[in-house]
């Protein structure tokens, strides 16, 4: 999405202000369709190859759509559209599994890509440190103890077919809470990133991260982060309140004593304490749309003119909206995202982070068994009205 000059930004700001006061309705415009069922590639790619992040996509230079929706062993998907994808069982990224929490490279999920015209793709990496399974000696407590999470940065130079850390670990770190790993601390840390979205008002890049529980001075909730340089993992700044993105993220290992307060993010109001699966700029609503799943329930929507002030999240798509034939394969909802296949042609958005009045909601379902219905990625057409 092309950034705007000062005059056009001012006009856009007035239009956004007018649009933000209107009521918004979101309704399903048709039944969900399966985009990928993990049982279809079970015997080829393995039982652990499942949708374990929200669905992401970008358009490569050759016109092929690349889709990311996987686990710690990353297999790419490609096809002519976001609806017609073929899974490749070659691993383009394998989790590092480093047992040192200060390296920020243990169990890694490749997520949130952003493509450039020259073939470079950067992606956020959700990185879990699980002392119950990776650290020696093993932790004798169970989750939510012995667990923390951070966000790193990966890069590809070939439109996503191969990946590496953007900088040698731990210097690929994007975001961490300012506290060292502690086995007795309840699960916490910045993780579960949304997609990266461009704000047309300032041309900067943003994403949302989630902290599950209070840790030190850091409250639980959603932190919005911003940068002008996607290639520099240290350039991201968290929201500090009063419209300012001035919170830097540093490694807590070796951080001077007493500095934690300078690295605490102000969490968003009106959003639940659950991960934001996807964010999109709506060219119809002139607002940002966020989709959220909490504890396996339905998908909630929230709207914002500026990524700071959000409406109270409201569940607008749930089990009752599914046809009976789909309900039998779904025990819970998870991993929502917004991908509009018309975005590339309509507004030049090769990262599918813009949506129009009619745009699909992507989401994943948990089934009954990995060998029968398993996890699936679905796409449901949604209609927006104001």
Stretches with model-predicted labels:
Residues 53, 107-109, 190-193, 273-275, ...:
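Beta-rich catalytic cores
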Residues 1-6:
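N-terminal secretory signal peptides that target proteins for export/translocation
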Residues 181-184, 331-337:
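Short, charged/polar low-complexity linear motifs in solvent-exposed/disordered segments
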Residues 57, 113, 194-196, 277-279, ...:
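Hydrophobic core register within WD40 beta-propeller blades
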Residues 187:
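Substrate-binding groove/exosite segments of carbohydrate-active enzymes
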Residues 8-23:
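Cleavable N-terminal signal peptides of Sec/SRP-targeted secreted and luminal proteins
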Residues 23-106, 114-183, 200-272, 282-328, ...:
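Beta-rich carbohydrate-recognition and catalytic domains
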